């Protein structure tokens, strides 16, 4: 039994609140257990300088945490005057993952910014950010589609992320909270599409190694969790938008 009473193959309780903010074209509050992230999508009718005139769009992301999202206060990065390496890595990961399921040609010459702001952290902030940012992004694109329908809906597939790991006494587990993540012998983040394709695997042994059998178990757990997360995404977005993503 895990520290929070879950089975090894169970996600934390997932709650998604759509339209959480009034101004962005798309927004959600996603809660994964005690981890809570506000994800918002903003549409700009311009692209980065290196893409101007190509007729293609772009997806970019920024990630941040409230100073007291963790058990001790962190100094705001804006006060430090620079973004940390961890933050840069995470926001690049979010943008890269989302671009994997978007037809940038179909999007047209516009940028969609995803802002992922962690208001409470208990492990899995980057995976929750990706899962929530996907919903916010699709909401924004769906609003564009309602105003002037796309000849081809830009979102090609669903996308979600989760964590898996190996605990010293608990074996392989799905969706680690902070206590588990801190003590895990192996920690892995998995990003997958709705059709079962991998977008990214980030796996590391923490002063430990893992076998091919354990790797297979971790991937199987991740696939199960992501399948459940994508069903939640579909419920949140509704049948009409889900059908557009499927090309129906």
Swiss-Prot record:
Q: Which Pfam families match?
A: RNase_PH, RNase_PH_C
Which EC class does it fall in? transferase
Keywords noted in UniProt:
Nucleotidyltransferase, RNA-binding, rRNA processing, Transferase, tRNA processing, tRNA-binding
Q: Which reaction does it catalyse?
A: tRNA(n+1) + phosphate = tRNA(n) + a ribonucleoside 5'-diphosphate
Q: Does the keyword Nucleotidyltransferase apply?
A: yes
List positions binding phosphate: 86, 124-126
Top-level taxon? Bacteria
InterPro entries given in the database record: ExoRNase_PH_dom1, ExoRNase_PH_dom2, ExoRNase_PH_dom2_sf, PNPase/RNase_PH_dom_sf, Ribosomal_Su5_D2-typ_SF, RNase_PH, RNase_PH_bac-type, RNase_PH_CS
An individual GO BP term: rRNA catabolic process
> Where are its TM segments located?
none
Which EC number(s) are documented for this chain? 2.7.7.56
**Matching NCBIfam families:** RNasePH (TIGR01966)
What is the documented function of this protein?
Phosphorolytic 3'-5' exoribonuclease that plays an important role in tRNA 3'-end maturation. Removes nucleotide residues following the 3'-CCA terminus of tRNAs; can also add nucleotides to the ends of RNA molecules by using nucleoside diphosphates as substrates, but this may not be physiologically important. Probably plays a role in initiation of 16S rRNA degradation (leading to ribosome degradation) during starvation.
Kindly give the PANTHER family that the UniProt entry links to this protein.
EXOSOME COMPLEX COMPONENT, EXOSOME COMPLEX COMPONENT RRP41
Task: Return the protein name.
Answer: Ribonuclease PH
What organism does the UniProt record list as the source? Answer: Listeria monocytogenes serovar 1/2a (strain ATCC BAA-679 / EGD-e)
């Amino acid at each position: 039994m895990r520290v929070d009473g879950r089975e090894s193959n169970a996600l934390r309780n997932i709650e998604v609140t759509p339209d959480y903010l009034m101004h962005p074209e798309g927004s959600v509050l996603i809660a994964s257990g005690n981890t809570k992230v506000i994800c918002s999508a903003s549409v700009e009718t311009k692209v980065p300088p290196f893409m101007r005139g190509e007729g293609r769009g772009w997806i970019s992301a920024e990630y941040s945490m409230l100073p007291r999202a963790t058990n001790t206060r962190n100094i705001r990065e804006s006060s430090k005057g620079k973004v940390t390496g961890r933050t840069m890595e995470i926001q690049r990961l979010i943008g890269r993952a989302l671009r994997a399921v978007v037809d940038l040609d179909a999007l047209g010459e516009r940028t969609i910014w995803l802002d992922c702001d962690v208001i409470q952290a208990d492990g899995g902030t980057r995976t929750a950010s990706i899962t929530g940012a996907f919903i916010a992004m699709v909401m924004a694109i769906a609003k564009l589609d309602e105003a002037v329908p796309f000849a081809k809906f830009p979102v090609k597939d669903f996308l979600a992320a989760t964590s898996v790991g190996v605990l010293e006494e608990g074996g392989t587990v799905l969706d680690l909270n902070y206590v588990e993540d801190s003590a895990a012998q192996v920690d892995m983040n998995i990003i997958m599409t709705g059709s079962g394709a991998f977008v990214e695997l980030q796996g590391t042994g923490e002063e430990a190694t893992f076998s091919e059998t354990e790797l297979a178990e971790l991937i199987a757990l991740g696939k199960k969790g992501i399948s459940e997360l994508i069903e939640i995404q579909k419920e949140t977005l509704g049948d009409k938008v889900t059908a557009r993503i499927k090309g129906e």
